[in-house]
C-alpha cells in the first residue's frame, strides 16, 4: 500500500508551544492518509468525541524489537468501536501493516506505545448520540520508556469501577479513564503510587492502571473478569503462561483483606507488562517467585 509511506509535514504539529515541547516524545501518527510528525491535531471544538467522549482506543507495545500480541490489540480496538456504536472501518491486518510501517520511523529497539483510535466526529440532533457514519480513526506511535520493575505501593480507593449497565465497560473507551484517574490522584495524595479499585459489590476489580494478581500458599489468584474492568490482553496471556507452566491460577471474587495478607502481589498491563507491588498500605512486600516466574515467561513468549 503506497499510502503507508506518505508523510506530510504539519505546521501545527511542529509549532508546539515551548513549555510543552519537552513533554512530547518522538511521535508519528497516521491520519487522513498520511504520516504526521509530532502532536498532530485530530479534533476540533465541534468534534463530538472532544466534548462527549465518543472515543475508543487500544494500546500495544514495541520493545526489544518485538510487539507481543499486536494482532489481539488490533482486533480489540475494532471490537471496542462496534460496542460503542462507532464504525470499525480498518481491518485488523491493515492496522498491523500500518504499525509495521510506522515502526520503521523509529530505532529498531525503541520502546514505543502503539495506539490505534476511533472517534465520532459529529452527533445527531440534540448532541448526545453520535453519528456512527462520522467515525474517524488514526494510529499514533510514540516513544514511551518501559517502566523499571522497581515496585510500587498501593492502597484501597474510595472510588469504584462502574457496572456494565452504568458505563461502557465492555469497550476500551476513553470516557472510562477519568474515574481511574481520580482514584490515582486520591491515592497519591495519601502517599501511595496506585489505587486498588473495587466493583460495586466491594470486591477488588483492578488497580487504577492495570490488572492485579496475588499469590497465597502456592496459588495465584486474580479477580474474575465480571464486566466491571477490562479483561486485559496481558492479563489473559499471563494466566495462560502460568497455567501452561504448571502454576495453579484461580479467577474468583477477592476481598481487599485477602490482598492485605497475600504472600506477594503483582500487576499486569500493556504499558508496564508486569510489575511487582512492594507495599500495600503500611505492609512491605518483596517481589515474589510467582511474579518473577510470570515476568520471565512473558518475556520468553514475547521473543518467541
Whereabouts are the PLM-identified features?
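Short secondary-structure capping/junction motifs at helix and strand boundaries
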Residues: 87, 105-115, 150
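Helix-start/capping segments and mature chain N-termini
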Residues: 2-93, 97-101, 119, 124, ...
Amino acid at each position: 500500500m503506497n499510502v503507508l509511506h506518505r508523510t506530510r509535514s504539519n505546521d501545527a504539529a511542529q509549532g508546539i508551544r515551548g513549555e510543552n515541547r519537552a513533554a512530547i516524545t518522538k511521535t508519528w501518527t497516521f491520519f487522513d492518509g498520511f504520516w504526521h510528525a509530532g502532536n498532530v491535531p485530530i479534533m476540533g471544538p465541534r468534534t463530538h468525541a472532544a466534548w462527549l467522549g465518543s472515543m475508543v482506543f487500544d494500546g500495544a507495545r514495541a520493545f526489544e524489537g518485538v510487539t507481543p500480541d499486536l494482532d489481539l490489540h488490533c482486533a480489540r480496538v475494532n471490537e471496542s468501536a462496534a460496542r460503542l456504536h462507532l464504525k470499525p472501518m480498518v481491518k485488523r491486518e491493515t492496522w498491523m501493516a500500518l504499525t509495521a510501517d510506522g515502526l520503521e520511523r523509529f530505532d529498531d529497539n525503541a520502546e514505543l506505545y502503539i495506539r490505534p483510535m476511533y472517534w465520532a466526529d459529529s452527533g445527531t440532533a440534540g448532541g448526545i448520540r453520535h453519528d456512527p457514519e462520522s467515525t474517524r480513526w488514526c494510529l499514533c506511535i510514540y516513544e514511551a520508556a518501559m517502566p523499571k520493575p522497581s515496585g510500587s505501593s498501593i492502597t484501597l480507593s474510595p472510588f469504584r469501577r462502574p457496572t456494565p449497565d452504568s458505563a461502557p465497560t465492555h469497550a476500551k473507551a476513553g470516557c472510562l479513564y477519568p474515574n481511574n484517574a481520580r482514584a490515582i490522584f486520591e491515592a497519591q495524595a495519601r502517599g501511595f503510587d496506585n489505587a486498588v479499585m473495587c466493583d460495586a459489590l466491594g470486591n477488588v476489580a483492578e488497580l487504577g492502571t492495570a490488572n492485579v494478581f496475588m499469590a497465597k500458599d502456592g496459588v495465584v489468584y486474580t479477580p474474575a473478569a465480571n464486566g466491571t474492568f477490562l479483561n486485559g490482553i496481558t492479563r489473559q496471556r499471563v494466566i495462560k503462561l502460568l497455567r501452561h507452566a504448571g502454576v495453579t491460577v484461580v479467577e474468583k471474587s477477592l476481598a481487599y483483606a485477602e490482598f492485605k495478607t497475600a504472600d506477594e502481589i503483582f500487576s499486569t498491563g500493556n504499558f508496564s507488562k508486569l510489575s511487582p507491588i512492594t507495599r500495600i498500605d503500611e505492609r512491605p512486600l518483596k517481589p515474589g517467585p510467582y511474579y518473577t516466574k510470570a515476568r520471565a515467561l512473558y518475556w520468553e513468549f514475547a521473543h518467541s
